[in-house]
Every structure is written in structure tokens, then in C-alpha cells.
Amino acid sequence: MATQTIEGSSRSGPRRTIVGDLLKPLNSEYGKVAPGWGTTPLMGVAMALFAVFLSIILEIYNSSVLLDGISLS
């Protein structure tokens, strides 16, 4: 048998900690979904702004567009 229980073993339930007690209310909404689109448009805007940010960083790194007229030395 792969698993075996030992008779008379004292195994208590999960330990209660201060951090666990503080974080418990945050997990009380688990599984509940807000009706409609919720914050999806906000996430879309955030993703678009992040894509613009990454493209600006890439352009600076490649010295392709933003730094054409600037000498670095």
C-alpha cells in the first residue's frame, strides 16, 4: 500500500498564525465573479500603456528613433 495511516497518531488541524488571520478576509471573495466586463477595459488600457513603454525602452536601447539627433559622447 502506498499510503498508510498510523493508529493513534496525533495530527492537529492547520496552525493559526497572525499573518493567516490578517490575510483571511482577502480570501473570502474567492470564486465570486463580478457580473459584466468588470475591470477588463482598465486592464486593456494598462496593457496598451505597458506595450508603449516597452517599445520606447526598446527604441532607446537600439538607439533607433529617439536618439538619432543626440550624440552620447
Curated annotation (Swiss-Prot):
Which parts of the chain span the membrane according to its record?
41-61
User: For this chain's UniProt record, which GO biological process terms are given?
Assistant: photosynthesis; protein stabilization
- Show the GO MF annotations: phosphate ion binding
Q: Which Pfam families match?
A: PsbH (PF00737)
Subcellular location field: Plastid, Chloroplast thylakoid membrane
Q: Which UniProt keywords apply?
A: Chloroplast, Membrane, Phosphoprotein, Photosynthesis, Photosystem II, Plastid, Thylakoid, Transmembrane, Transmembrane helix
Return the SUPFAM superfamilies for the record.
Photosystem II 10 kDa phosphoprotein PsbH
This protein's superkingdom?
Eukaryota
Q: Which residues carry this modification: Phosphothreonine?
A: 3, 5
InterPro entries in alphabetical order: PSII_PsbH, PSII_PsbH_sf
CC terms in the record's Gene Ontology section:
chloroplast thylakoid membrane; photosystem II
User: How does it sit in the bilayer?
Assistant: Single-pass membrane protein
Question: What post-translational events are described?
Answer: Phosphorylation is a light-dependent reaction catalyzed by a membrane-bound kinase; phosphorylation occurs on Thr residue(s) in the N-terminus of the protein.
Family statement = Belongs to the PsbH family.
Q: Which HAMAP family match?
A: PSII_PsbH
NCBIfam families assigned: PRK02624.1 (NF002728)
Report the PANTHER family cross-referenced here. PHOTOSYSTEM II REACTION CENTER PROTEIN H
Q: What does this protein do?
A: One of the components of the core complex of photosystem II (PSII), required for its stability and/or assembly. PSII is a light-driven water:plastoquinone oxidoreductase that uses light energy to abstract electrons from H(2)O, generating O(2) and a proton gradient subsequently used for ATP formation. It consists of a core antenna complex that captures photons, and an electron transfer chain that converts photonic excitation into a charge separation.
Q: What is this protein called?
A: Photosystem II reaction center protein H
Q: What organism does this protein naturally occur in? A: Nymphaea alba (White water-lily)
